[in-house]
């Protein structure tokens, strides 16, 4: 053993293990080296290489792919219990925990290093969301990248869909970019514009249309993709349990609701609801988006389509019952007087964007006079150059403009008119990597800092998810955007612009991994109250809560614990709260017995960490570890057996009890000790985020068991339930702040953070602490940091 230890220590000092920073070396020698000496080197050194695996010469450079893969195999063998073999002395739970944590932390750091490794020029492909927002800000065209055949889905890394090294380009992407460019330009510059019309449908007075849950009514046509205004006069008849009907516009082709609103207006006081929204080409209908089967009553059957007053309705002996004996509706119903559709609408601001890039004379017949034709070509060059500068977010080089003018000439030589040839050049601009990518750096003059044009894009895509506007372009052209005072003024301007709402919707979706909400739809037998509008409302609560913290510039402490939230009528019903005074989301106060506040106890987070049938404490613990503390736990061992239902001949047991029985094995307990305490605190919430005091258990004997949501942190602090847990989290605000800044930087810089970023993150946190970690102050300190201007 001494000989092996001497060899290993010698290699540590030399090439095989590699030179590392002092902190890593200390952690290695304290946590990993003793484990390897005791349990590994007898079979995996210079004298034996069982399984053709040698550990003593395995490089500790996790930044290389080959080394990282070998270390991943080591972690896999330890986690799976394969190593050390059962015939050898077995490590303790604590020893396994230390070595797996060291390998996992080094693997994460190595992954981040590989992802962040860049050459003299870095290319960051726009996400689908950014592509669509840029199209709108450039040309005033609403392009839906989620439409069938539009753009490919973006891969995610830990929830983020804008990480440069992950957003690769395939032939499929290229093909779809060309199709998208053609679609966008057809909408921006149609050969024959479609006139705007108003079409109204009215019920024959005094009758009104009655729309039942999950039922469609009427017909609305969008002849071309565009902006439309839908107006409906209607009223609501809530169910006897208080559930409100929801008016939505149903897309017949895509089978989805495009826009909608809860309706509160009483039967005798109808209201006019207006939606102004982009619609793809096709047919639409009004729908009452309340579910067709509720616990309020039985499923909806055949019913009348018109009625004057619901109280006057008397069904035939074979008719369908709509009212209880006391006159209250069984179902949430809509009463519609009329509806109308106006469009397509072209806003003046959108038209102005397009006109600046397209010479109007291109719509006329080509002039016979060569001099007039030359002038038209010169005008086309100027317009095209402006378009390239805006689309590529930098001034184009003369040779780049020349290249596209040659394309125009080639198109004309092939028989196309000047208008078509010019549109072909515009399509080339939109399919260029200069448009589809954010390009930083120079192959000719390598540099560590982004230039002013790149800085303008970095700032605008951070806060607006889109291209810089004219003022930001102007500052970049003057070359003074790097000046701290100029950058801060522009930062404040962008922050206060309505387009910053894109940031407050996009960042929390990625940070909190809200894309996972609804991935495992709840079992309708167990959760009959769950519906798609509740699912969307869950996400909207989280993004709306985030925006409220942003808008009021309160402390990020509110993300952990608050005495308020935002909710609409659907969530109020879900949470057992009074309905807000009007439709939509509103800030509402919370009291202790609500057991809400902050993001951790929002239904979105609680449901995304469940599996559709029951809550998953381990998943919830992993989520808290990643989203709140910025630490991804080691992967679970392979072939982990799922928790079995309680046998019919045994007492009902909570999932907590089953997990504790499962974690008696050392390879399981090592990780569960750190994860479980972060997830079991939320056992009072079921799979869709409802509060409960007993856990409903299928099978088994006896009553459903009482929920116990107490526990302790790894440092020994104890809590009794989610409210105390969140209170303890606020005591770790410094730690959360650094994790939050890391998430923010990952989003803004489009890459994983490395150990080199840690001092900058700590400095930003320290500066922000002086203002109690107020949100806008924190973002301002991040933008002012050297890291924001570095490549």
What feature does the model see in each segment?
Residues 63:
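Glycine-rich, highly charged phosphate/nucleotide-binding loops
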